[in-house]
Amino acid sequence: MPQSWEELAADKRARLAKTIPDEWKVQTLPAEDSVIDFPKKSGILSEAELKITEASAADLVSKLAAGELTSVEVTLAFCKRAAIAQQLTNCAHEFFPDAALAQARELDEYYAKHKRPVGPLHGLPISLKDQLRVKGYETSMGYISWLNKYDEGDSVLTTMLRKAGAVFYVKTSVPQTLMVCETVNNIIGRTVNPRNKNWSCGGSSGGEGAIVGIRGGVIGVGTDIGGSIRVPAAFNFLYGLRPSHGRLPYAKMANSMEGQETVHSVVGPITHSVEDLRLFTKSVLGQEPWKYDSKVIPMPWRQSESDIIASKIKNGGLNIGYYNFDGNVLPHPPILRGVETTVAALAKAGHTVTPWTPYKHDFGHDLISHIYAADGSADVMRDISASGEPAIPNIKDLLNPNIKAVNMNELWDTHLQKWNYQMEYLEKWREAEEKAGKELDAIIAPITPTAAVRHDQFRYYGYASVINLLDFTSVVVPVTFADKNIDKKNESFKAVSELDALVQEEYDPEAYHGAPVAVQVIGRRLSEERTLAIAEEVGKLLGNVVTP
């Protein structure tokens, strides 16, 4: 007899719970809203394991390569902390510590025999968003109808990371459909922010944001079609890289709307530092992914591009544009302060900072919103209805059910509109450079209109999604935290739209006190090396080279 969707979900939750050994179970869950420091006082991790999980990925791979740490030691530490993270934040879809430790033992045996690492990530545990396929495990994408189907092979990126020496131990939670910036589905429920359980961890790579935020992971792999790497990074006070399409391999990953080629989802890392973002990116590019994924551009890591930024920083400074309002939705006071703080730090260090006028972001936001629903939402609704489960309420914030499926001629016209908009934006970029008499190195902007938002209150995607439409490289840099004593409600606010009013009405200085605040550093398309270097400079000036 077919099982109901509720029974299928309950079975999955029961199977997931059994993957946590009894000795790693939290006996009494903390009552406090913030659980960010709970792993340190849980008694589950030893002092040595705490030290490992508090270290950077760059430091860990250095010690693993030198034989100062074994992969089993490092993997066990992160498995234990990930188990705690799962119990506190509900951040996992799959957890497989036994397989991870077996993989770690194989790597240790290789090192003992050959006296060298297998690759740049030798022995390092890396957490994977549920989209990445790992042979033998489920990829549900937050759909109940996808449960009980086991992957017969790895995604290309999974293969690349495995070749580089990474260890896999967890696949993290995503929202139903992937198409929202809140992580909730009918299988496991809601994933929460470890800094405050009343705040969203972001989405769709929300499980990655939560697990890396609480240091149950050191490098997390996410994806981004409308902010899904950058928003979880921002909400968890982390760094996140949204590379341009074609830089890192996406082949053989699961996705909603597969075959949609107008705006591409991209894959990238979430970490505690730019150094670790760079480690991940260089390690993957070192595996020559263009030989495995036909959409990847044959472009190895270009150190010369990083060096150009280093030279500019040393000799006269960078030329940075900035904006704090896209003309559609005004950010909350903490975000406005975050942009102001970043701009002031850059100016104080001698960099040139100039206001940037966002170009037709209302058009860009409207266009990409129509692209998301170009099939009339048929793809996602098919996978939702297949099990009889209801759609999560958040879907209506991004996928408009009133938009009808487009025909081929309308699709071609959409492609042309996107291309024209991209070229118009490049023209504005060039005009700014001609006016300044030098390159515009990057633009500083909000990534969301809110600090880490309260559950089910994420309304506006435009600060993130327009960058997807333009396919610019973007790096999220954590700035500060909301402060009720500084970030007072804007009493003179006048809305430019109903959505603008709705977002601003959500702001409560008390409720948002302590919420992470971030900005994004936006570079030209395929400018990963330069944009990472600029983000590193920004993080250094803000005192956030490595986040806690």
From Swiss-Prot:
Active site, per annotation: 129, 204, 228
Q: How is this protein induced? A: Acetate induction mediated by facB regulatory gene and probably by amdA regulatory gene. Omega amino acid induction is dependent on amdR regulatory gene.
Which GO BP terms, alphabetically? Answer: amide catabolic process; regulation of amide catabolic process
The enzyme's E.C. designation: 3.5.1.4
**Enzyme class, spelled out:** hydrolase
Alphabetically list the UniProt keywords.
Hydrolase
- InterPro entries in UniProt: Amidase_CS, Amidase_dom, AS_sf
Presence of keyword Coiled coil: no
Catalyzed reactions: a monocarboxylic acid amide + H2O = a monocarboxylate + NH4(+); acetamide + H2O = acetate + NH4(+)
Q: Could you tell me one molecular function GO term of this UniProt entry? A: amidase activity
PROSITE patterns for this protein: AMIDASES (PS00571)
Instruction: Establish whether keyword Transferase is in the entry.
Output: no
Q: Tell me the Pfam families matching this sequence.
A: Amidase
| Family of the protein in this entry | Belongs to the amidase family.
What role does this protein play? Allows acetamide to be used as a sole carbon or nitrogen source.
Q: What is this protein called?
A: Acetamidase
Tell me the classification of the organism that encodes this protein.
Eukaryota, Fungi, Dikarya, Ascomycota, Pezizomycotina
